[in-house]
């Protein structure tokens, strides 16, 4: 999850889900006009709107999700406004709302990285605990993965939850590897 500049990377199409950045579970779609004009879309008979971007909608849009997605972006931009001075160098060529959003993402990334580093440093020497991820000093996300010898991930999550620490213990969309 990161900052994308569709113009800088000359993206034809970008799809995302706002739940990745504090919004609801729904889809968001960017498409260059010339690419969109060449795409066919499924249509319902009662809908004769053939112009982009409306022809990509297959029915009534869920306004609650659209509102939630917009508010998620507003949430990020608000954080960016409050922390813009921290990222003047990185955002020198940006202005307005784009700058606010980028500063918000950078502020959250910075905060999450600090928390993850604190966690990694705090647990790395626990006997029987194996920490997974890139070597120190290499780029990494704020995701911290570990196992504890002799315990399954569900039991670890329950023990931590009993102490007010909440972690994910699922298969992270890789259930087949757990079955093997």
Regions found by a protein language model. Give the residues of each.
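Pyridoxal 5′-phosphate
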Residues: 1-180
């Amino acid at each position: 999850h990161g900052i994308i500049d569709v113009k800088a990377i000359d993206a034809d199409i970008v799809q995302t889900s706002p739940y990745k950045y504090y919004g609801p579970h729904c889809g968001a779609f960017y498409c260059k006009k010339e690419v969109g004009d060449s795409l066919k879309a499924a249509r319902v008979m009662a809908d004769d709107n053939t112009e982009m971007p409306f022809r990509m909608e297959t029915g009534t849009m869920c306004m609650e999700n659209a509102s939630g997605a917009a508010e998620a972006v507003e949430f990020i931009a608000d954080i960016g406004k409050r922390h813009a001075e921290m990222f003047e160098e990185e955002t020198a060529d940006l202005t307005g709302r784009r700058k606010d959003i980028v500063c918000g993402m950078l502020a959250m990334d910075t905060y999450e990285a600090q928390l993850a580093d604190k966690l990694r440093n705090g647990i790395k020497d626990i006997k029987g605990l194996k920490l997974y991820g890139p070597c120190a000093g290499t780029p990494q996300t704020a995701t911290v993965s570990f196992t504890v010898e002799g315990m399954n991930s569900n039991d670890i999550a329950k023990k931590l939850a009993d102490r007010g620490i909440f972690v994910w213990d699922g298969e992270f969309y890789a259930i087949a590897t757990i079955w093997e």
